[in-house]
Amino acid sequence: MRILVTGATGFVGRTLCAVLAESGYQVRAAVRVDSRLADHMSERVVVGDIGPGTSWDAALRDVDGVVHLAARAHVLNDAPDNTRLYFETNQHGTEALARAAARAGVRRFLFLSSVKVNGEDSMTGAYGAADEPHPQDAYGKSKWLAEQAVRAVAGQSGMQAVIVRPPLVYGPGVRANFLRLMRWVDARRPLPLAAIDNRRSLVSVWTLCDLLATLLEHPAAPGTWMVSDGEDLSTPDLIRRIGRAMGRPVRLVAAPLGLLGVLGGILGKKAEVARLCGSLVVDSAPTRTKLGWSPPLSVDEAMHRTVAWYLSEGRPRDS
C-alpha cells in the first residue's frame, strides 16, 4: 500500500514515516519545501503551504491511504492577527485535502486532531471520543471544524474517515513545557511544584505512531479515537520520572498554588502555569478494547528514549 503522509518532516511525521516503512508500506512524504529526507521516505512531493488552494493531484496519485498530520501548531499566547491562519490551514486546508483524496479514490483518510477539541481541562472526568466538544481557542476550534469537514466528505464519498485526538505528545524534538521540565531537572533547580495534585494524560510519539499504523488497515478503524500511554501522571510524578530517566536528583518544594498563579501572571506565563497545575485526562480504554491494541512502550521506556534524545541533542548549546 502507498500512504501519503503530510507533515512528514515534523515532530510526529518523522517517526510515523519510519514506522510505516518498517511495516512494509510505501511512504510518500508531502513536504512544504524541498529538503533532504531520511532514507525511509522513499517518495517525496512538494506541496507548499497547506490551505484551501493547495494542489494535491500529484501527491495523491496511486495513493491508498492518507495520514494528515500537517497543521498550524498551537502556540501559547499567539498573536490575535494569526487566528485566521489556524482556520486557513487546519480547517480549510484539511477539507481541501479530504475532498481531493476522495476524488482520487483514497480508501481511508486518517486525520490527526487534538484533545483540545474536547476542551482545556477535565476536572469533571476523563474526556471521551463521544463527549460533546468544547474547544476554547482558535486551534481547538479549527481542529473541530476540520473533523466535521472530514466526516462530511467521507459521508458524501464513501471514503473512510479516521480521527485521532491525542493529548500532549512527547518524544525526540518535543518543545514547550515538557522540554522546559527536562531542562529544569537537568540544571538541578529546585522546583516549587510539589503541592500540585493533578492528573494529565500523555502519549509518546512512538505509541501515537503505532496506533496510527494500526488504524490504516484495522476493520474497526473508521470513527474517532482517544489515545494515551495508559498511565496518567501528576506534574510532580512527571518530574520524578524525568529525573529517574536522566539520573538526576529531583528537588521539589511546595509552594501555594495561588502564588504560582500570581507569579505566572507577572511573568507573562499564565497559560504555561495553568497547564502545569491543571488536569487533562483522556479515556483511551475504548481504543485499546475495541481495536485489541495496546501501547508498545511503557511511560518509563518512552521517557528514557526521550531523555536520551535530550541529552544528546536537546540541551541548550551552552550546557
Regions found by a protein language model. Name each.
Residues 174-180, 194-216, 222-223:
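Substrate-positioning beta->alpha
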Residues 3-23:
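N-terminal Rossmann NAD(P)H-binding glycine-rich loop of SDR-like oxidoreductase domains
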Residues 171, 193-199, 225-233, 243-247, ...:
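Glycine-rich Rossmann NAD(P)(H)-binding loop
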Residues 95-138:
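Conserved Rossmann-fold NAD(P)-dependent oxidoreductase catalytic core, especially the SDR/UDP-sugar
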Residues 81, 88, 92, 122-169, ...:
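Catalytic helix-loop patch of NAD(P)-dependent Rossmann-fold dehydrogenases
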Residues 215-270, 300, 304-307, 315-318:
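Mid/C-terminal beta-alpha module of Rossmann-like enzyme folds, strongest
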Residues 205, 237-240, 263-295, 305:
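Conserved C-terminal active-site "lid" loop/helix of NAD(P)H-dependent oxidoreductases
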